[in-house]
Amino acid sequence: EAVSSDSGRTIQTMGIILQELGLTGEIPYRYDKRIREWCFGSFDGAYDGDLFMGVLPRVFKVDDFHQLSLMELAEGIVEVDTTGWAESWRALSSRIKEGFEAIAKELEAAGGGNAIVVSHGMTITTLIYLIDPKAVEELVLDNGSVTVLAYEDGAFHIEKIGDMSYRKVGAKLLEGGHDE
């Protein structure tokens, strides 16, 4: 099964993945809005630096937003959002947990197996935090990184976080003049 958030960039990424793996049309693919990126309210679409390097550190009187917990970040975004669209930590973490658990439970009910899921950096970081808070200390996920989770007996287990090895192999192939 393949699942992505319903945002354009995850749909595009999933299309590339399925095409490269030869799975386009071969496995079911659907969207799930619960695994969307965090809603940054009035900062959605803005330059990340404005929010993370400017506004939030000033609101919390810290030098670096990395000093803030995910909960503090979420609540800070709610505080500075002028649209009322930003989600509280409770709403955000519940949405993300429900979305990924639904995918896992559906797969489990079908007899198990693997799913390809394309989501977003802050969303994946939040899910990892909900599984193991210590795992996100100092964590910054690169775009296109691969995180592998297992789901067994009603719980997620982290197998790999932010793996970039396949991109390094691809970069070497491109350097060698190969198109594929």
What are the residue ranges of the model-derived segments?
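Active-site metal-binding loops of divalent metal-dependent hydrolases
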Residues: 121-122, 164
